[in-house]
């Protein structure tokens, strides 16, 4: 016989279970204010000190745990530098294991970038001096240690680079760091009851059920009314995001990995693969608070239906709540920004070689072969090649020390107005790219290319690249 009391008890228990499963930060009346990474702005050869440290930090409110980071902080400071300057880096490894560091997107030689050929042992230091020759862009630095990059990056070895040039400084774009030019480093994680990061090393992917930005869940930021610039880095190990605003208002994409688009692209959502970066402009001249979210907008009932959802689904899909304050800017109705870029002109470069790479997301093989450090892909300096990338599942791809233009996605050509220099892309079927090699690498200090899913990369879904 149906028992109403038992049925009500089950409903109450279900609700209690759902609410207890939520992190406390999501149940609080107010969100945490967004943590802005410290800014290290270097001029005229001022050195940049980066110590790799074990630090204490509360990923979950009230639960301080050991994580990794730089200069005593979880995650790293944002390094800001201008084209034409030199970056005098000073790394020191205070961690108990060796680490290989690299700067994804930075255009420099293999010897100066570091990478897999430069293992920084415990207590060891390394001080490369890197000339900055590229156009304005957003890059990021993280661990690339062979077979250990996912774990080390997941623990907190990640940070942002901002490169400015004359065009970006005179563009009129929002540029006040942490005020209307906001750095956002996205990670998904799993935590145990003590708030410690959970990591399973023998998997080909890691999908956390909790979304962090700059080391916080679902934070807010107060911003002045007007246009706000978001610099996004997907530092997740495997997850790609489809980002949108919860009120479906338009956004403007102005830059990708390696720099500006020819003109701003108006869109309502954008996909961000692991390692990929994007710069968005949001119009906050009018209206109230708005949330940047990953995936579709959710209602309150999702708290309960999520009990039966995929265990990899994010508990809260809020990236950031933007809270505008003050009066609207008198310059609020600015024209659609346009930028000078040589990207489109390079579509007609002479192609010296064509290659095909197929990535197996189940086995980690590239072109049906496991990783072998003796197997090297050789390219000639100052040439352009056409690469066709395919995979048997959705996978992020990235290349170090070089840059590329996307010619087509699944045999559909990319509009010239959307052409921009890149170093990371999502493969969901087939992608055809033009790769330009402007910097040297060697057998001792090679570049890497392959899976941007660091779990899969640690399984060997990568290749070494020597440019001479």
From Swiss-Prot:
It is found in: Periplasm. InterPro entries: Cu-oxidase-like_N, Cu-oxidase_fam, Cupredoxin, FtsP, TAT_signal. The gene is ftsP. Its main location: periplasm. PANTHER family: BILIRUBIN OXIDASE, CUPREDOXIN SUPERFAMILY PROTEIN. Belongs to the FtsP family. This is Cell division protein FtsP. Residues 1-33 form the signal peptide. The keyword Acetylation does not apply. Predicted to be exported by the Tat system. The position of the signal peptide cleavage has not been experimentally proven. Keywords: Cell cycle, Cell division, Periplasm, Signal. One of its GO terms (cellular component) is outer membrane-bounded periplasmic space. SUPFAM superfamilies: Cupredoxins (SSF49503). GO terms for molecular function: copper ion binding. It comes from the Bacteria. Cell division protein that is required for growth during stress conditions. May be involved in protecting or stabilizing the divisomal assembly under conditions of stress.
């Amino acid at each position: 016989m149906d028992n109403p009391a038992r049925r009500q008890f089950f409903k109450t228990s279900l609700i209690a279970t759902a609410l207890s499963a939520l992190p406390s930060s999501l149940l609080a009346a107010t969100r945490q204010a967004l943590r802005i990474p410290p800014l290290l702005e270097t001029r005229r050869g001022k050195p940049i000190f980066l110590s790799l440290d074990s630090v204490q930090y509360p990923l979950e409110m009230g639960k301080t745990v050991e994580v990794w980071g730089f200069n005593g902080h979880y995650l790293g400071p944002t390094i800001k530098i201008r084209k034409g300057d030199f970056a005098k880096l000073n790394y020191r490894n205070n961690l108990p294991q060796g680490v290989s560091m690299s700067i994804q997107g930075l255009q420099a030689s293999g010897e100066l970038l570091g990478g897999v050929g430069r293992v920084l042992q415990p207590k060891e230091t390394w001080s490369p001096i890197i000339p900055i020759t590229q156009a304005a862009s957003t890059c990021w630095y993280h661990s690339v240690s062979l077979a250990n990059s996912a774990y080390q990056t997941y623990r907190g070895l990640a940070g942002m680079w901002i490169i400015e040039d004359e065009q970006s400084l005179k563009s009129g774009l929002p540029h006040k760091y942490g005020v209307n030019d906001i750095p956002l480093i996205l990670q998904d994680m799993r935590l145990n009851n003590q708030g410690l990061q959970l990591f399973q090393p023998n998997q080909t992917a890691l999908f956390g059920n909790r979304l962090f930005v700059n080391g916080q869940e679902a934070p807010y930021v107060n911003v002045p009314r007007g246009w706000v610039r978001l610099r996004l880095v997907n530092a997740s190990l495997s997850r790609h995001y489809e980002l949108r605003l919860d009120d479906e208002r338009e956004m403007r994409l102005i830059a990708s990995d390696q720099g500006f688009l020819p003109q701003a692209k108006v869109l309502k959502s954008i996909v961000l693969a692991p390692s990929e970066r994007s710069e968005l402009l949001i119009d906050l001249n009018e209206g109230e608070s708005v949330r940047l979210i990953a995936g579709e907008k959710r209602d309150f009932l999702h708290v309960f239906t999520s009990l039966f959802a995929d265990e990899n689904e994010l508990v809260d899909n809020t990236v950031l709540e933007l809270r505008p304050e003050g009066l609207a800017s008198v310059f609020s109705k600015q024209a659609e920004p346009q930028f000078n870029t040589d990207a489109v002109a390079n579509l007609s470069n002479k192609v010296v070689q064509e290659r095909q790479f197929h990535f197996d997301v189940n086995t980690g093989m590239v072109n049906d072969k496991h990783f072998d450090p003796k197997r090297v892909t050789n390219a000639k300096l100052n040439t352009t090649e056409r690469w066709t990338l395919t995979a048997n599942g959705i996978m992020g791809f990235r290349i170090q020390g070089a840059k590329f233009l996307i010619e087509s996605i699944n045999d559909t050509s990319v509009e010239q107005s959307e052409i921009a220099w890149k170093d990371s892309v999502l493969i969901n079927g087939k992608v055809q790219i033009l790769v330009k090699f402007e910097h040297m690498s060697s057998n001792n200090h090679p570049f890497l290319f392959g899976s941007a899913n660091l779990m899969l990369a640690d399984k060997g879904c990568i290749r070494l690249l020597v440019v001479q």
